[in-house]
Amino acid sequence: MRGTSFILFAVVVILGFLNANAEPLANPAPLANPDPLANPDPLANPEAFDLLGLVKKVASALG
């Protein structure tokens, strides 16, 4: 079993070195939305999770 584990470890190490030495793409495709402030998500609600309100509700329920 030690031999199999060593072989798998060696394969992972070799693949890691190959991946680390791979050249990046010359001109990668731009992100779909590079500036999140330019086109905010219309479904995002900053008030959806009110932590302070939740703490106050729990404190009032316990006390």
UniProtKB/Swiss-Prot annotation:
GO terms for cellular component: extracellular region; membrane; other organism cell membrane. Residues 1-22 form the signal peptide. It comes from the Eukaryota. AXPX repeats lie at residues 22-25, 26-29, 32-35, 38-41, 44-47. GO terms for molecular function: toxin activity. This is Venom peptide 2a. Changing D50K: In amidated EpVp2a-D2K2; no change or increase in activity against bacteria, and no change or decrease in activity against fungi. No change in lethality when tested on water flies and lady beetles. Decrease in hemolytic activity. It comes from Eumenes pomiformis. Belongs to the MCD family. Mastoparan subfamily. The modification Leucine amide is found at L62. The keyword Transmembrane does not apply. Residues 23-48 form a propeptide. Antimicrobial peptide. Shows activities against Gram-positive bacteria (S.aureus MIC=50 uM and 200 ug/ml, and B.subtilis MIC=200 ug/ml), Gram-negative bacterium E.coli (MIC=100 uM and 200 ug/ml) and fungi (B.cinerea MIC=5 uM, S.cerevisiae MIC=128 ug/ml, S.pombe MIC=128 ug/ml, A.nidulans MIC=128 ug/ml, and C.albicans MIC=64-100 uM). Shows cytolytic activity against insect cell lines. Its hemolytic activity is controversial, as Baek and colleagues report no activity while Bea and colleagues note a hemolytic activity. It is found in: Secreted; Target cell membrane. Transmembrane segments: none annotated. GO terms for biological process: defense response to bacterium; defense response to fungus; innate immune response; killing of cells of another organism. Expressed by the venom gland. Keywords: Amidation, Antibiotic, Antimicrobial, Cytolysis, Fungicide, Immunity, Innate immunity, Membrane, Repeat, Secreted, Signal, Target cell membrane, Target membrane, Toxin.
